[in-house]
Structures are given as C-alpha cells and as structure tokens.
Amino acid sequence: MEERVLNVELRTKTGKGISRQLRRNNFIPGVVYGKGMESVPVSLSTKELSTAIAGEGGRNHLLTLKGGGGLDGQMVIVAELLQDCLKGTPRHVDLHKINMADKVRVKVPVNLVGSAVGVKEGGLLDFAMHEIEIECFPTHIPEHIDVDVTELTIGHSLHIGDIKELPGIKVLGDATVSVVSILGKVKEEPVVDA
C-alpha cells in the first residue's frame, strides 16, 4: 500500500471552543500517540485528511507526518476517525504512530470475487462481514481481502476460517463466523384482501 504525506500542526490549546474554531476554519483536531511517546495534540486540514484516506484501503494507508515537535517523518495510520453523524465530515482523528518493525492489527475491506452458483439458482447473497481484522507488518497491509464466492451454493456459507491467508498476513477472528452466505429462495405469499 502506498505511503502518503499528511501535514499537521501542534496544538497548544485544547477544548471544545478551540475544536469548534478549528472546524470553522476547515481544520480538525487530532492526537498522535504510540508506543513509548506522550500523546501530542495536533490540528490538520480536513480536506488534506480526506484526500489522504480516500480510495481503496482508506484508513489503512501509511501516512508520513510533516510538522514540528518531533513529528516530522513519523509513520502513522488512522486509528479512529470521528465523523459528524449528519454531514459525514471529520470531527476528530486519532493517529497511531507505528514502528515499521512491529506488526499491526487493522481492519481491511472484504472484496467478493465471482458470481455465486447459489445466486444463479435463485438464492440471495447475504454479505454479513464487510471488514476483516488482520495482523501484519505495516508494509504488507492490503487494500482489501478477496473472497471467492463462485462455488457457493444455496444454504452454504464462507466463514473467516475459510479465507485463504496471504503471505505475511494473519486473518484474525472466530473461524466459525460467517462472512458471506447464500440464503434459500424466498417464496412469495399471495396477498389476501380483507
């Protein structure tokens, strides 16, 4: 996955009032934290953050920070992004500093590949798990995990344990949890007028 640059500025003041002022000026408050360091409050451009996490892979892009206070050149990933529930705009971001020599746990999107036999037979595809948690080195984070549904028939499911692991990537979670299923045909009952 490609690395992207994210400009940040150190924040000396914190609180609701400062956060509101930042948002009015198209900036959002954030914090950078990680192993062996104190949390550092920062602010960053809303547009720049949206651009940095746009596209497939989203929040899992490796971001190189540019800014003062010893943050210049630090590698981070978006640990949490709070968004306005009505507008969908970012309100706060947590950036997790990562060590390239340590494995990280991230959630990646599931990409369904192929046309399921069960769907062709009239079944209904139930895509239950859109993201899967994995563990790998930061340079091995995939944009998505492909799951082939071609052979899936009515009444059958693919579980986390059925996902083929890629080299250097460990799929986490309960192996018995369903990722995708093919449900049986739905019978339509005639509508009876009263």
Curated annotation (Swiss-Prot):
Known function: This is one of the proteins that binds to the 5S RNA in the ribosome where it forms part of the central protuberance.
Family: Belongs to the bacterial ribosomal protein bL25 family. CTC subfamily.
Keywords assigned: Ribonucleoprotein, Ribosomal protein, RNA-binding, rRNA-binding
SUPFAM superfamilies named among the record's database cross-references: Ribosomal protein L25-like (SSF50715)
Protein name: Large ribosomal subunit protein bL25
Database matches in Pfam families: Ribosomal_L25p, Ribosomal_TL5_C
GO cellular component, as recorded: cytosolic large ribosomal subunit
Example of a GO biological process term: translation
Oligomer and partners: Part of the 50S ribosomal subunit; part of the 5S rRNA/L5/L18/L25 subcomplex. Contacts the 5S rRNA. Binds to the 5S rRNA independently of L5 and L18.
Primary gene name: rplY
Coiled-coil annotated residue ranges, if any: none
The keyword rRNA-binding is annotated on this UniProt entry: yes
NCBIfam families, sorted: bL25_bact_ctc (TIGR00731)
Higher taxonomy: Bacteria, Pseudomonadati, Thermodesulfobacteriota, Desulfuromonadia, Geobacterales
Sample GO molecular function, one term: 5S rRNA binding
